[in-house]
Amino acid sequence: MPPFYIVITFLLSTVFRISQSVHHHLNEEELKQVFGVSNKHDVPEYSLIEATRHPLKNGNLKMKFTAWNDTYHLNLRKNSRIVSPHIISVVRHGDDDVTTYAGLRDYEQCHYQGEVKSHGNMKAAISDCGALMGSIVMEDHFLVLQTLPKRVHHLQKERHLVYKRSAGLLTNAESKIREEITRLQEEQESFCDTSEQLDDPAMTIPAHLHFNYTIPTSAQLDSSFIFPNMDPITLEIGLFLDSKLFEHFEREYIQDAEQHLLEFSLALINNVHVLYQQDTLTPNLDIVIVRYEMWRTQPSALSTGVHKNGQAQSLLDAFCRYQAHMNPGTDLTDMNHYDHGVLLTGYDIYHTTTSVAGVAPVARMCDPLFACSLVEGLHLGRSFVLAHEMGHNMGMVHDGVQNQCNKGCCLMSAVNGAGKTTWSDCSVREFNAFLLQLDESGRGNCLRDASPGLISTNHLSDLRLPGQRFTADQQCSYFWGRDYKVEIPNGKAMDDICRILWCGNSGSTISTAHPALEGSWCGANKWCHKGQCTHWTFGLTPVPIDGEWSEWGGAEKGCPIQQCAVSGSITVQGQHRDCVNPAPNNGGKTCEGANIRGIVCGATSSNCLGFTREEFGNKICSSIKYDPHKPDQQLTGEGFEHSTQPCRVWCHLIGSELIRNKGQFPDGTPCGFDAYCVGGQCLALSCDNKALVEQPEDCPRIEGRSVHQWEEWSSWSECSVSCGLGGREVRERKCSSGRKCQGVSEESRPCEGVLRDCEEFGEWKEWGSCSEKCALGVQKRFRPCLTDQCSSKHLQEERPCDNEGCWTNWDEWSSCSQSCGGGRRYRIRKCLDDKCDGDDLEKESCNTQKCISQSWGDWLPCSVSCGIGFQIRERLCDGELCATANKQARTCNQQQCPSAFSLSVWSEWGEWTTCSATCGEGLQSRERSCRRGSCTEDDASQTRRCVNGPCEHSYLTWSEWTTCETCSSFDSRKRIAKCDGTTENCQDKIDEETCDIACLREKHSFGPISPRRPKLITSNDLRKAFGRPLLPIESIHSEKWSEWGPCSVTCGSGRRVRTRGCQEASCPEQHIQTEECNLNSCLELFIWSDWSSCSKSCGQDGIQTRQKLCLFNNAECSSYAESRRCKDLPSCSSISSGRTISENGFDAPRWSEWSSWSACSCFSLTSTRRRFCQVVDPTVQGFCAGAILEQIPCAPGSCSPSAGGWSLWSEWSSCSKDCGDTGHQIRNRMCSEPIPSNRGAYCSGYSFDQRPCVMDNVCSDEKVDGGWTDWTAWSECTDYCRNGHRSRTRFCANPKPSQGGAQCTGSDFELNPCFDPARCHLRDGGWSTWSDWTPCSASCGFGVQTRDRSCSSPEPKGGQSCSGLAHQTSLCDLPACDHESDGEWSAWNEWSGCMGNCGIGTRTRVRACVSPPVSDGGQPCFGRSSEITECRQSPSTALCSSFITSSHLADGYFIDTDQQQ
């Protein structure tokens, strides 16, 4: 299927009748300038106006005009911000000789903003400089004011007009778009490369992660946030032109090369600006030059030694760093700061393909280093390439390759072709997503600042279209090189250049990356217009221009040093001239003669002994085939001698008869008899052996005169026939100084002597067999002689031959070119006779597994607004949180906290009072006292809601027991407690006990019991009653107590019994015991653990914690922890304590102990443990090197969620200040006891705490600023196989800052990936088969059954673990139970009070599955048992922390952060 591209065609419609007709006199450029449209049929409704202006003394302006029978009154104020006076232009001669110019001349402030007083103070922006223009924002449309071109002023008295424009992003005409698919037969080549390997850690990330932002859907593109009204999108650029480009213009323009280069570069930027002002791109982007730098000599950082042709990546890397160094300040600090650096280069940045012409980093705009692009700058068509590369830098990707748009459509297409002058919908979405990312990044969007730019240059001001300024031949020479001109391939016509400009150099035909420029002559009496070859419609038709030669150039360089590369070479100075004085255009005649010649330096005899021509060609072809940077592996490595183009190096292609031009022989290389190479052409030695020319007219002048003399006649040629009659001989002579010698230059005569009769032969016979079975042999064939005399050598022919099977065995495969993401490897074999069929090189794909891309996210905001806090960031692997080493933390210090003496200092909170209600909902309170400062009374106490268990139902007294007829345990008695009717849903209570207990109750005064009669008890009955065999009478003695029997009730206080047997005569006093059991409330679903040991051994800061443990896996119970201060601890003054100092002599941060391993995750099949970096001394910057967590594979035993629990607090750090001010102490804990697993809840509350500390000593005047220690050794690699990293740190302790000295600047932590395939024998895990389903947990009603599998077939070893669930649970399909009761939710409780920090918080409400509860196999309640919503506190009750800007609440408790000093 041939490639295709999309041509966007606008189907335009006229929506109103225009009363005025002045627009019919405007050309297309004027229509665009005035109305923003290209077609006269699309002109909007407008009115010609006469604007009256009244300047005021304060510099403001009043203006009035009438349009559509309505008068508009405007009050305007000067806007002096749109132009900066600090523009800089630079001409550089190397590093030391620099000329700098500053400022704009003759600039006046003539731009205004204001309101339309006559129309509801609608906003207006008006400019009244050389021309009046501006806009008025009405409610449902815009009014746009414009000045008419001077060319049509004579047609009417009005000089201005105003027209209406829809407020939509697209006009009605623009919204009617049709896509037409046009197929192309031409080959399309990539013209763009994106930088992926710049020498910077951030640039080693694969390209598809360079732009880690979300691309919005088209439905989101009208967001007022993405397109804010009046919010400028301006790209300020620094434009750099390298010395190679300057050399090109110095060759082309003998005089004023700098001026020509300036005009050309500004024209190119002007074209780019037009592309970014298209209606297909929203919002439009203004491009302004704030720095212009021309290098007549290359800076040392970008000298030729640093790079060479074909090294685009290294050149871009060097330039990006150079322009970043030259870029002053920031957008906020320096008005000469630019957003993006552009290098227009004269180098061929990719020598393996002439199509690739630009390269830029992806999504790095506003980056301080890599907001830059590199583009070949020899042709105006590079404006398309530069716009494309700038698009990459602003987040756009290739259409059809990395998004869903057509790959052949628009400016972000990755291939060459015509019609690519618009932006696709995908590019618009990507551009706006990148703008949104910059807006939300927190670093600022450098594109949203107003431009202080250079005055724009309109290169159409002389009314010449680009194609009239630069002919089609000049466009080819700028694009491909000096020798390239328009060359139409077979099957094409001249008018095709308007769609694709074809260029050639008498070799292979090449298509350029753009159509011919607007106004280019395309044959007959036609010119290019909008991609079509049409008649001229822009006024006077251009007249034909005949070409004339420029002067010969190159003489000023002198003769080169002789280079003996090819044997027999002579020293030649090449000279060149161009047909550009003027260039032929519009069908005019081209120059006659050659454009190149060579001046012989010295003698024509040569003693050079170098390579043969064959050896030199082979050397060039082989070096290009095996180039380490850009190899051309289609070449065989062998050269080819071309008979008609002997001065070009041609190389064979593998597996075909094709050849490819890969260079040329050096000037002076012999290419025939008395002929030598100059600039890739073979020229004859002439002009008295003084020059190499194509014709005598090109000989250099000798002292101002020409010599017109014939050279000697050549020898007679051989006869034109070898036998028979009719042959002739020829001889020639040449005019030494041109074509003005008298006489003829050629003579001929009949052949002298008698020729023999011609031989006649029969047909050739078939070729014989090859003389060798393997390797080179010979084949012969014969033919008969049909005359009397035939030479024997004419009767036989030989040719070389070989047979198949002469290959050596294949070599081993080479190493793969990539470690992941798809690479290539190859192997070779050799042919024993150099004539084998087949390829000597074989390639295949390798390492196709996906690369794991990793990137650290931004640091989260500091945890505190003042003092020492923490910041956290996460590491993403392929867009998801990495499995290991996925978090980092560091200390942060936003600003110093206010002095403790200016704050209110409170004592610790007292204990919470007992709940005011014993059941249901009540209140608790606690108090604290003011220690220092201006405390407010309202902050001295807190109240919170408390909820105890549900209130018990009210019952009447118990009834009498029923009667026991025996004392057997097989009989029982009952009693009933009736409800008193005061509560709802109350059911009668029934109490039951066995009669043996009743008898004991009577015997031991438990209560009366009725008379009983004997009952026969068999041994079987006893065995059932006591659960053991009946013993003989003689063996009955006192026995051990039996196990306790079951409790009489499951909750609400019951009793249980145990017994022991004995002989009647020796029975102890008691052989039956009872006790209470199941004392918990019937609604209790949890129990509290014991209080932990105190976190401190002395003082008042000790903390004890306990956990709430759920008794059942029920939605109504959620685990959490609570803490309290330890009591009765001794004073720390009696206990000596000291802080351990590290061997370095300072308190370095240190790792905490590892936590316990988490429960095995059913999702990742791993168990995790973690630790945290404990800050001992806040004044010592630094971090802990090594992994913050570890993971091991595991097989889960259960998939039940496990909520996390806090570890104990670490010890308080030392004070962050050592003198004279209030500092802070910090401590840490982590959610690791246990670590949450299987999607269990994370801990609520802070993982860190801080309190103020006051240093009484006064700082001395001798401040000590901090200094860095050496970097620590790299930590061990966390995983040599997957996502491995190692880290190192350094400390601000050499010396440690003291006496108010400054902290160290720079990074205190470094992280590097590590990977060692030698240590990995990677093996991905595989699931075992599922086990059988377990029996159902119930026989009726609600029951479940489970099954499981393990990641053991095989177990993972460094590779991927199994994905999916290891356990499955399913509901059983059971019949209903006889008396089952499904659970139902109770009504929601009232919302709790609002709890939060600084007026913003949350409130909760709960419900329980008790209306009714589940019983006898019924279904449980499904859904949430609690809800949380945001709320706002009234100003009178809102509480704010002094040191922390946001609070996390844990189950209604305020986290106490304002500790005592």
UniProtKB/Swiss-Prot annotation:
<dbReference type="GO" id="GO:0006508">
    <property type="term" value="P:proteolysis"/>
</dbReference>
<keyword id="KW-0645">Protease</keyword>
<feature type="domain" description="Peptidase M12B">
    <location>
        <begin position="233"/>
        <end position="435"/>
    </location>
</feature>
<feature type="domain" description="Disintegrin">
    <location>
        <begin position="464"/>
        <end position="546"/>
    </location>
</feature>
<feature type="domain" description="TSP type-1 8">
    <location>
        <begin position="1087"/>
        <end position="1133"/>
    </location>
</feature>
<keyword id="KW-0325">Glycoprotein</keyword>
<feature type="glycosylation site" description="N-linked (GlcNAc...) asparagine">
    <location>
        <position position="212"/>
    </location>
</feature>
<dbReference type="Pfam" id="PF01562">
    <property type="entry name" value="Pep_M12B_propep"/>
</dbReference>
<keyword id="KW-0964">Secreted</keyword>
<dbReference type="InterPro" id="IPR024079">
    <property type="entry name" value="MetalloPept_cat_dom_sf"/>
</dbReference>
<feature type="disulfide bond">
    <location>
        <begin position="723"/>
        <end position="758"/>
    </location>
</feature>
<feature type="domain" description="TSP type-1 13">
    <location>
        <begin position="1382"/>
        <end position="1435"/>
    </location>
</feature>
<dbReference type="InterPro" id="IPR000884">
    <property type="entry name" value="TSP1_rpt"/>
</dbReference>
<dbReference type="Pfam" id="PF25379">
    <property type="entry name" value="Adt-1"/>
</dbReference>
<feature type="domain" description="TSP type-1 1">
    <location>
        <begin position="708"/>
        <end position="759"/>
    </location>
</feature>
<keyword id="KW-1015">Disulfide bond</keyword>
<feature type="domain" description="TSP type-1 3">
    <location>
        <begin position="804"/>
        <end position="852"/>
    </location>
</feature>
<dbReference type="InterPro" id="IPR001590">
    <property type="entry name" value="Peptidase_M12B"/>
</dbReference>
<dbReference type="InterPro" id="IPR002870">
    <property type="entry name" value="Peptidase_M12B_N"/>
</dbReference>
<dbReference type="GO" id="GO:0004222">
    <property type="term" value="F:metalloendopeptidase activity"/>
</dbReference>
<feature type="disulfide bond">
    <location>
        <begin position="1340"/>
        <end position="1377"/>
    </location>
</feature>
<feature type="disulfide bond">
    <location>
        <begin position="1215"/>
        <end position="1253"/>
    </location>
</feature>
<dbReference type="GO" id="GO:0005576">
    <property type="term" value="C:extracellular region"/>
</dbReference>
<feature type="binding site">
    <location>
        <position position="398"/>
    </location>
    <ligand>
        <name>Zn(2+)</name>
    </ligand>
</feature>
<feature type="glycosylation site" description="N-linked (GlcNAc...) asparagine">
    <location>
        <position position="69"/>
    </location>
</feature>
<feature type="disulfide bond">
    <location>
        <begin position="405"/>
        <end position="410"/>
    </location>
</feature>
<feature type="domain" description="TSP type-1 7">
    <location>
        <begin position="1035"/>
        <end position="1083"/>
    </location>
</feature>
<keyword id="KW-0865">Zymogen</keyword>
<dbReference type="GO" id="GO:0030198">
    <property type="term" value="P:extracellular matrix organization"/>
</dbReference>
<feature type="disulfide bond">
    <location>
        <begin position="719"/>
        <end position="751"/>
    </location>
</feature>
<feature type="domain" description="TSP type-1 9">
    <location>
        <begin position="1148"/>
        <end position="1200"/>
    </location>
</feature>
<feature type="disulfide bond">
    <location>
        <begin position="816"/>
        <end position="846"/>
    </location>
</feature>
<feature type="disulfide bond">
    <location>
        <begin position="866"/>
        <end position="897"/>
    </location>
</feature>
<feature type="disulfide bond">
    <location>
        <begin position="1336"/>
        <end position="1372"/>
    </location>
</feature>
<dbReference type="InterPro" id="IPR041645">
    <property type="entry name" value="ADAMTS_CR_2"/>
</dbReference>
<feature type="domain" description="TSP type-1 4">
    <location>
        <begin position="853"/>
        <end position="898"/>
    </location>
</feature>
<feature type="binding site">
    <location>
        <position position="392"/>
    </location>
    <ligand>
        <name>Zn(2+)</name>
    </ligand>
</feature>
<feature type="binding site">
    <location>
        <position position="388"/>
    </location>
    <ligand>
        <name>Zn(2+)</name>
    </ligand>
</feature>
<feature type="domain" description="TSP type-1 2">
    <location>
        <begin position="761"/>
        <end position="802"/>
    </location>
</feature>
<dbReference type="GO" id="GO:0046872">
    <property type="term" value="F:metal ion binding"/>
</dbReference>
<feature type="disulfide bond">
    <location>
        <begin position="1231"/>
        <end position="1243"/>
    </location>
</feature>
<dbReference type="Pfam" id="PF17771">
    <property type="entry name" value="ADAMTS_CR_2"/>
</dbReference>
